[in-house]
Amino acid sequence: MEPSPDAPRAGAAEEQPGPSSSASAPAPAASSNEEEGRHQSQAQQQVQEAQPQPLAQQAPAAAGLSRYESQKRRDWNTFLQYLRNHKPPLTLPRCSGAHVIEFLKYLDQFGKTKVHADGCAYFGEPNPPAPCACPLRQAWGSLDALIGRLRAAYEESGGRPESNPFAARAVRIYLREVREAQAKARGIPYEKKRKRGAAAAAAAPPVVVAPPPVVTAPDDATGTSGGAGEDDDDDEATHSGEQQDTTPAASPTTPPATSVGTTTAAATAAAAKGSAAKGSATSS
C-alpha cells in the first residue's frame, strides 16, 4: 500500500526533535549569574558604606548654601580623593596628624604666595622690587582656615572629636612653624585676631560716667541728722510765723502801751505850756 498524503507529514512530525536538554540548560546558568551579580552588588554597597562618603552625598544640597559650607564640602572631597590616591591607599580611620601634615605639604605645589628662602636677596622684604626664583607656597592663613573647615567636616561626617586628626597637636605645631617661617621670609608679622567683643569695645567712643558721690558713714549720719533738724526748724518757724500772723497782739509792729501813754502826756504838757504863754502875752 502507498502511504497516504498525510503519512509523510506525520513522520516528519515524529522526526522533529523536541526540546532537548541542551536548550533547557541555560535557565539554571542564567539564575546562577543573577545570584552572583546580586552578591557582587551587595559587596560593593558594603564597601561603599564602610568608606567615608563625601559631604555632598551624605545630605541633599540645601538651597542657598553659604559660601563657607560650599568651600567646606569641596575641601572635604579633595581630602578624600587624596586618601584614595595615596600610596598605599589610606582610609579615614587610619588617618593621623602626620598624614594631615603630608596633605598640607602636598597642597604647597598649588600655592600662589611667594616665600623667600634664607639665601634670597629679598628675604624679609614685604615688597621685593624684582622677581626671584623662590618657590610659591600656600599662605599660612589659607592653611589655617583649611584645617578649621576640615576639622568641622570630619565631625559632621560621623567622626569622633577625640580621634579627629585635624585637631592633633602635631598639626597645630606645624601651623605655628609655618606662620613664624613665613613671617620672617615675607617680612609680614602675623598678629593675633582680636575678639569681636574687644574690637567693638575699642571702636566704641568712651562713655563718660559721673563718679558716684563719696559718702562717709559719720558725715552721712551727721548730715542726715543736721538736715532733718534744719527741716524741723524750718517747719517750726513756719508754724510760729503762721501763729504770729493770726495773733495781732503778738505782732512786732505794734508799739508797747507804755510808750503811747508817755507820748500823750508829753503832748498834753506842751499844749498847757502853750496856753499859759498865750495868756501871759494877752494880759501884758
UniProtKB/Swiss-Prot annotation:
Region of interest called Disordered, as start-end residue ranges on this chain: 1-69, 209-284
Compositionally skewed regions (Low complexity) per UniProt: 13-32, 40-63, 246-284
Any one annotated GO CC term: nucleus
GO biological process: mRNA transcription; post-embryonic plant morphogenesis; response to light stimulus
GO molecular function ontology, one term from the record: DNA binding
Chain ranges of the ALOG domain: 67-194
InterPro entries documented for this protein: ALOG (IPR040222), ALOG_dom (IPR006936)
Keyword match DNA-binding: yes
Assigned keywords, A-Z: Developmental protein, DNA-binding, Nucleus, Transcription, Transcription regulation
Role noted for this protein: Probable transcription regulator that acts as a developmental regulator by promoting cell growth in response to light.
Sequence similarity: Belongs to the plant homeotic and developmental regulators ALOG protein family.
Stated name of the protein: Protein G1-like9
